From Swiss-Prot:
Documented EC number(s): 2.7.11.1
UniProt entry tagged with the keyword Nucleotide-binding: yes
Keyword Oxidoreductase: no
Broad EC category: transferase
Positions bound to ATP: V55, G56, E57, G58, G59, C60, G61, A62, V63, K77
PANTHER family referenced in this protein's UniProt entry, alphabetically: CYSTEINE-RICH RECEPTOR-LIKE PROTEIN KINASE 3 (PTHR47973)
Family matches, as SUPFAM superfamilies: Protein kinase-like (PK-like) (SSF56112)
Swiss-Prot/TrEMBL keywords: ATP-binding, Kinase, Nucleotide-binding, Serine/threonine-protein kinase, Transferase
Taxonomic lineage: Eukaryota, Viridiplantae, Streptophyta, Embryophyta, Tracheophyta
GO MF annotation: an example: protein serine/threonine kinase activity
InterPro entries noted in UniProt: CR_Ser/Thr_kinase (IPR052059), Kinase-like_dom_sf (IPR011009), Prot_kinase_dom (IPR000719), Ser/Thr_kinase_AS (IPR008271)
Family: Belongs to the protein kinase superfamily. Ser/Thr protein kinase family.
Protein name listed in UniProt: Putative serine/threonine-protein kinase
SMART domains: S_TKc
């Protein structure tokens, strides 16, 4: 089956045929480089996707730690894709559409992707301190070391990321799944909002969109769950739970 990726048309090639530069909403170059990786390159980077390099797993696939040929440490998400049902395909496209042109210190950086037959991979910066869920909701030892200064900095960082997504970038982005496991932490415990597989784009002037309810129970806003009307406030509610 031949698949079409409209979102990949938002990139233009450079002299290196493995590197593309994203375009902004006005057709100009945003300056953010987005790389198209080969499956072989990613397989080598994480030692054949060995279990020792697996750092996480969820309903959409597994995440592996890897090292690129230039020494860059990355996290490689290998999506579970079923082409007939499009399972995983929508999440893949949503992630690229949301992050390919977004640049903020509190958003996870998307280096690029891999599209080969049924293979769909996304390549991000590697986060040394895992996630907020791991650090704060995991072992008691981790939780005890997570002092109030770290907690405040994490909350401020996530708030800044949401302000950027909701107001500063165009089209605006509603994440739809803000939760502790989707807030990653770098080596200095700086927060990076991640996992945009459920994200929706809002054009300028759009106050809400009607869509199926998706997200995580406990973090979903009651208004969205009942009405299926998604707004920026849905993310704000999830942030309040966080």
């Amino acid at each position: 089956m031949k698949m079409c990726f409209p979102c990949l048309q938002c990139f233009c090639s450079t002299s290196d045929d493995k590197v593309v530069v994203s375009k902004n909403d006005k057709g100009g170059e945003s300056g953010k480089k987005f790389r198209l990786f080969s499956y072989h390159e990613l397989k080598v980077a994480c030692d054949g996707f060995s279990s020792k390099n697996k750092v996480g797993e969820g309903g959409c696939g597994a995440v592996y730690k890897g090292r690129l040929t230039d020494g860059t440490m990355v996290a490689i998400k290998v999506l579970s894709v079923e082409l007939e049902s499009m399972r995983g395909e929508r999440e893949f496209i949503s992630e690229i559409a949301a992050l390919s042109d977004a640049q903020h210190e509190n958003l996870v950086n998307l280096h690029g992707c891999c599209v080969e037959e049924a293979t769909r991979c996304l390549v991000y910066d590697y986060m040394e301190n895992n996630s907020l869920a791991y650090q704060f909701l995991g072992r008691e030892q981790n939780r005890n070391s997570f002092d109030w200064t770290k907690r405040k900095n994490v909350l401020l960082g996530v708030a800044k990321a949401l302000a950027y997504l909701h107001e500063e970038i165009n089209p605006h982005i509603v994440h739809r799944d803000i939760k502790a496991s989707n807030v990653l932490l770098d080596h200095n415990f700086n927060p990076k909002v991640a996992d945009f597989g459920l994200a929706r784009l809002f054009q300028e002037g759009t106050s809400h969109i009607s869509t199926r309810v998706a997200g995580t129970l406990g973090y979903l806003s009651p208004e969205y769950a009942v009405s299926e009307r998604l707004t920026r406030k849905s993310d704000v509610y999830s942030f309040g739970v966080l």
